[in-house]
């Protein structure tokens, strides 16, 4: 057993102090764009991501106004103007002056009504029993909702859908937050809205906004690949749209105030992105450097240097999976080995920046310094830098907040280092993951203020997938709205003598509470067939003991899962509540699938698991 002490309050505070940051220009290795989009979603990815009572997220609209419009309505210095200009640069296309002016006029009107609504809500907060204050708030809410419906059309103008996509995603984000706010206000103000109608509208708009963003992201990516074989341009589009569009829509699921009626520890954004390559861009447009694998935490590096000129010739990454007692995993070799090597394991802190020194003559790396959040520097080199004129210095990081906040609260941490090409001076790539994704799978029941809290764990943070018979479990690329990779279970009917086909998704947990706690568990998934108690099903075990059944339902037809929509995924709860022991790392959650081959259908049976959520019993 791991004797590491689990301090509940300390764990709950992990990644919880996320303030809205002022908009700054930031650099993605040569790509300059605004960080305001990320500032908008930061309050929604910490421990206190979703607050179930008036206050907190109910006030998120007012809190976001100075982020989106830092200089007020009269200035073009606003989020929407910035993201439109950024997208023009990425796509190397211009939005017509007419479309821009039309959108900005609409935005000015939207800002005025947003501020108009904010003032009314501020007044109501101080006069909650005043019927006139309530009536005024209702009226202004209704006007703002109508204004959003009318305004969304201006962010999807024909022939400009891709160029306007980040602006559309941010407007959709604000509209859904407003609709969510209305549902929450209805809990404390009688008949504030027509609840059933309003909730259906919330769900419809959410689905519509996700579909639009997913469709036009794909079309934009296809379009840019048809125009160029330049990896830099393609990577810039992918990184920028992931950060400014897909990350936003991936959080829309959590805006539902009925499903998320408690504070929630979100770990949605497991999707990784690349900063610009160092040295030459990869030669092959169709390389796929993002592996569809289980999540791993970078723990160290082994670097190899040439015997004579001491330039970097190769390296290996070292990882640990989410089981903290497991051995360090040795990654693939990039380049080639020598007898000159440096091997170092990082501490439990995360790497937020890499400083690289490149020989100006050999055009090869001679020194790597990895910087972590505990002020440590990990130097991988076999030479001292004495004549700075002989070398070029590059600082590689992916941070979308103020440059002054890079170390204090980086938006992304290093996930993996890559190399492409046959020579040591070919392309080096650095892969990054969002800072909300913790290395382990902590399970909470309450936050530091003793409020119940929902814990979300992506299926991709399993430590192991195991198969029995003809069933296959594997990590695959998730749809645009899930936030990252997902787990696919597939099995086909084959004539053999196997008595059973099966598979297990193994998820290690660290429980962070002082007494045994019971949880309801729900799973977000898609499936092309139904659970059947007699010969098809899924169950949950804890340390090999059966604790609950997962009765999944068919959500889509056919065997093609490559283009599933948001409406093809759903939550279902396990039948039983599950008790977990307190303060231990000796808990393994196993989601097991089983099929009797004699009763399989003729088509491939598919279940796709995105995330598992744990809701403590009050």
From Swiss-Prot:
Domain of life: Bacteria
CDD domains with a match to the protein in the record: delta_endotoxin_C
Compartments, record wording: Secreted
Any one GO MF annotation of this record: signaling receptor binding
Main location: secreted
Cellular component annotations (GO), alphabetically ordered: extracellular region
Pfam families per the UniProt record, alphabetical: Endotoxin_C (PF03944), Endotoxin_M (PF00555), Endotoxin_N (PF03945)
SUPFAM superfamilies, alphabetized: delta-Endotoxin (insectocide), middle domain, delta-Endotoxin (insectocide), N-terminal domain, Galactose-binding domain-like
Stored InterPro entries: Galactose-bd-like_sf, Pest_crys, Pest_crys_dom-III, Pest_crys_dom_I, Pest_crys_N_sf, Pest_cryst_cen_dom_sf, Pest_cryst_dom_II
Keyword annotations of the record: Secreted, Sporulation, Toxin, Virulence
Disulfide bonds: none
GO aspect biological process, one term: sporulation resulting in formation of a cellular spore
Functional note: Not significantly toxic to mosquito larvae. May increase the toxicity of the Pesticidal crystal-like protein cry16Aa (Cbm71).
Similarity remark: Belongs to the delta endotoxin family.
UniProt name for this protein: Pesticidal crystal-like protein Cry17Aa
Native source species: Paraclostridium bifermentans
Gene: cry17Aa
């Amino acid at each position: 057993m791991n004797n590491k002490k689990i301090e509940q309050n300390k764990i709950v505070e992990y990644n919880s102090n996320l303030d809205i940051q002022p908009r700054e220009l930031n650099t993605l290795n040569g790509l300059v764009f605004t960080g305001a989009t990320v500032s908008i979603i930061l309050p929604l990815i910490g421990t206190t991501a979703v607050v179930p009572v008036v206050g907190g997220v109910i006030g998120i609209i007012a809190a976001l106004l100075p982020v989106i419009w830092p200089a007020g309505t009269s200035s073009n210095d606003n989020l929407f103007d910035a993201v439109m200009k950024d997208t023009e640069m990425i796509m190397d296309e211009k939005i017509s002056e007419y479309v821009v002016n039309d959108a900005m006029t609409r935005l000015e009107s939207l800002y005025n009504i947003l501020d108009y609504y904010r003032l009314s809500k501020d007044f109501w907060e101080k006069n909650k029993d005043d019927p006139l204050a309530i009536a005024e708030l209702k009226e202004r809410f209704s006007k703002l909702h109508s204004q959003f419906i009318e305004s969304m059309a201006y962010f999807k103008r024909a022939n400009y859908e891709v160029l306007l996509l980040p602006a559309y995603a941010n407007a959709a984000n604000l509209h859904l937050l407003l609709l969510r706010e209305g549902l929450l206000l209805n809990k404390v103000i009688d008949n504030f809205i027509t609840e059933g109608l309003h909730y259906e509208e919330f769900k419809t708009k959410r689905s519509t906004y996700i579909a639009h963003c997913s469709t036009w992201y794909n079309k934009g990516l296809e379009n840019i690949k048809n125009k160029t074989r330049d990896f830099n341009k393609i990577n810039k589009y992918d990184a920028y749209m992931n950060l400014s569009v897909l990350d936003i829509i991936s959080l829309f699921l959590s805006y539902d105030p009925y499903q998320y009626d408690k504070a929630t520890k979100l770990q949605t954004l497991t999707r990784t992105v690349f900063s610009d390559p160092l040295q030459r861009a990869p030669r092959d447009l169709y390389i796929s450097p993002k592996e569809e694998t289980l999540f791993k935490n970078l723990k160290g590096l082994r670097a190899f240097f040439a015997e004579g000129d001491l330039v970097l010739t190769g390296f290996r990454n070292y990882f640990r999976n989410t089981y903290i007692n497991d051995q360090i995993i040795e990654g693939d070799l990039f380049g080639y080995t020598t007898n000159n090597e440096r091997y170092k394991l990082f501490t439990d802190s995360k790497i937020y920046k890499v400083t690289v020194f490149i020989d100006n003559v050999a055009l090869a790396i001679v020194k790597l310094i990895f910087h972590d959040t505990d002020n440590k520097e990990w130097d991988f080199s076999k030479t001292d830098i004495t004549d700075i004129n002989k070398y070029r210095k590059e600082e590689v990081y992916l941070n979308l907040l103020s440059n002054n906040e890079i170390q204090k609260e980086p938006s992304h941490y290093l996930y993996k280092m890559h190399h492409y090409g046959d020579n040591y001076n070919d392309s080096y790539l650095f892969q990054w993951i969002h800072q909300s994704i913790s290395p382990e799978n902590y399970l909470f029941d309450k936050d530091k203020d003793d409020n119940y809290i929902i814990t979300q764990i992506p299926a991709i943070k399993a430590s192991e997938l195991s198969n029995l018979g003809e069933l296959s479990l594997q990590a695959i690329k998730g749809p645009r709205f899930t936030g990252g990779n997902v787990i696919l279970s597939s099995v086909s009917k084959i004539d053999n003598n196997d008595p059973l086909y099966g598979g297990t998704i193994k998820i290690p947990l660290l429980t962070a509470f002082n007494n045994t706690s019971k949880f309801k568990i729900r799973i977000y998934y898609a499936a092309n067939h139904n659970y059947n108690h007699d010969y098809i099903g899924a169950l949950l075990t804890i340390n090999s003991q059966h604790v609950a059944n997962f009765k999944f339902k068919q959500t889509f037809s056919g065997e093609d899962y490559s283009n599933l929509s948001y409406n093809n995924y759903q939550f279902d709860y396990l039948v039983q509540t599950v008790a977990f022991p307190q303060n231990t790392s000796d808990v393994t959650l196993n989601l097991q699938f089983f099929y009797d081959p004699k009763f399989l259908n003729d088509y491939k049976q598919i279940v796709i698991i995105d995330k598992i959520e744990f809701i403590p019993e009050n």
